[in-house]
From Swiss-Prot:
This is Ribosomal RNA small subunit methyltransferase C. The keyword S-adenosyl-L-methionine applies. It is an enzyme of class 2 (transferase). Monomer. Specifically methylates the guanine in position 1207 of 16S rRNA in the 30S particle. The lineage of its organism: Bacteria, Pseudomonadati, Pseudomonadota, Gammaproteobacteria, Enterobacterales. GO terms for molecular function: 16S rRNA (guanine(1207)-N(2))-methyltransferase activity; nucleic acid binding; rRNA (guanine-N2-)-methyltransferase activity.
Length: 347
């Protein structure tokens, strides 16, 4: 994430516009542009923990991680630069939150790759700001307008839920598999045939569906759930609460904030960061797993069959097995073996 994205390069084409402004960056920001941006003031609201990590050393208290922006973070900001995310519903949720706090007259810049659906920004915000396209470059569009009216925003109204067996799953915009259980997670769950116990880490927990379903089958599991998405963290907490399941839920960029070792790590790892294909998280998950598993501990993941995970698993663990597969997905498992005995050490 060190290089600038095409969307940020489009913003820099208009850098003179922002020199005297107090700018708030928000949305699917994936680079360090705010840390080097020339403006009278720069603040960032992000709901992605790894983006917060990237920027916090430089911007310190001027970057906020969380589901909802606060009036304190947005104080004194007169300009919003919003990066359009992959999910239209997520854009609606975030912009409704931001524009309900920013004062009337705030300049709004919306930027995003054309394939992300940024063109729909004009229609989406029509009741609150009249946006017009002011630039098109690098397969991106940049739109500008001023806030004419603040929208009403009630975070509780954005919650949705669905059922998986006897489990109620609570979800928010931007959370993976918001509307129903995805087929990859379904295949992963099908490989748990017997009750088990011990400590289990769910990396990239989404709405907490894996832990909640497995907790019904194996109530003695000690769960830790993690995700980079603030929406996923809140959704997981809500799912666990409504199903009366106790677990620790934390923000972590794969293992960045994980303490201790586990009997098992499970995951349906993402291979996108926003709309960009990225195997970084999955590679970190596999390569770092042995440092977070007990001897005999297992990493069990589901992934699209075409992704190059077998070689990564073999490099990290020495071997792997395929527990289940269908036309699209495979469930892989790898086990931490005992280290070879050093023949030089005395018995």
């Amino acid at each position: 994430m060190s290089a600038l994205t095409p969307a940020s390069e489009v913003i820099l084409r208009h850098s003179d516009e922002f020199i005297a402004r107090h700018v708030l960056f928000a949305g699917d920001l994936q680079d360090a542009l705010p840390a080097q941006f020339d403006a009278a003031g720069v603040r960032v609201h992000t709901n992605q923990y790894h983006h917060w990590q990237l920027l916090s050393n430089t911007l310190e208290e001027n970057v906020q991680f969380g589901l909802l922006a606060t009036a304190e973070t947005l104080a004194a900001c007169d300009t919003l630069i919003y990066y359009w995310p992959k999910s239209k519903q997520e854009a609606q949720f975030q912009l409704a939150n931001l524009l309900s706090i920013l004062p009337v007259g705030t300049d709004i810049f919306v930027v995003g790759e054309n394939r992300s659906g940024v063109r729909s920004a004009e229609e989406m915000l029509a009741d609150f700001a009249q946006l017009a396209k002011i630039d098109s470059a690098r397969r991106c569009g940049l739109y500008h307008g001023r806030l004419d009216k603040q929208p009403e925003f009630d975070a509780d109204a954005w919650w949705e839920s669905y059922q998986v067996g006897g489990v109620t799953v609570k979800t928010l915009p931007g959370v993976f598999s918001r509307d129903s259980l995805d087929s990859g997670s379904h295949l992963l769950l099908s490989t748990f045939n017997e009750p088990f116990k011990g400590s289990v880490l769910d990396v990239g927990c989404g709405a907490g569906v894996l832990a909640s379903v497995l907790a019904q089958q194996s109530p003695k599991i000690k769960w830790t759930l993690s995700d980079v998405s603030a929406a996923a963290i809140e959704a997981s907490r809500a799912t666990l609460a409504v199903n009366n399941i106790e677990a620790q839920v934390i923000a972590s960029n794969v293992y960045s904030d994980i303490k201790g070792r586990f009997e098992m790590i499970i995951s349906n790892p993402p291979f996108h960061d926003g709309i960009q294909t990225s195997l970084t998280a999955a590679e970190m998950l596999i390569r770092g797993a042995t440092a977070h598993l007990h001897v005999g501990g297992k990493l069990r993941i589901v992934a699209n069959s075409f992704l190059p995970y077998p070689a990564l698993l073999d490099a990290a663990f020495g071997s792997h097995e395929v527990l289940a597969q269908n036309g699209r997905f495979k469930v892989y498992q790898a086990t931490v073996g005992r280290p070879p005995r050093d023949p030089k050490k005395k018995r």
